[in-house]
Amino acid sequence: MFASSYVELLELTQRIMDDDGPKAKADAIIMYGQTKDNEDSIFLGVKRLYEKNLAERVVFGQGGKLVTRQDYLPDYQTKLIQLGIPSEAIIPLQITEALAHTHTEALAHIAHAKMRQWKNVYVVASPFHQLRAFVNTVSIVLRQYPELKVFSVLGTHLPWMDKAIHSQNVESGKRFELIQNEWKRIEAYHAKGDLVSARQVLDYLNQRDQ
């Protein structure tokens, strides 16, 4: 099981949803991709951080295929520039040549952070995706670059009762209905070995903040 108790899961969820921030300006904002129905959440979350001068740059992933076999080539750079983020502060990363998903995004982001020797980064995803995105990120950090300090910031709120397409454009429902499958994915990917446990993420947060 991903979490050993409801209390452990509740603690982790609350800390991810209301995380501390780094003491210094972050090296980057890692932006996890979303469908068009939900992408305003991540764009506005990233814009808010950047406008507050809390990070040097924004990183997003592209490349590979969706499960529908469509190329994953989001037009995020254009949209970030339209939001006022300068092009020189935007880094598009090739995340994979195979299947593009949250885990391959995390692998690419942390490999790039390690190459650049970044010290602090923010992770931004839509609220119902944030838990899985952050746990994926920390899982890769612990295995490949444990010196990196990763901080969680939610994308902006979107109405929970609105219908939206999610997860590679193949899942739809009201946004609150998408949470159940997010949890199922966390359990499945933990059982597969892709994700560390809730306890390991909490231990990472405690060590990060010492």
What residues fall within each predicted segment?
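A conserved mid-domain beta-alpha-beta active-site/ligand-binding segment of alpha/beta enzyme cores
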Residues: 96, 163-210
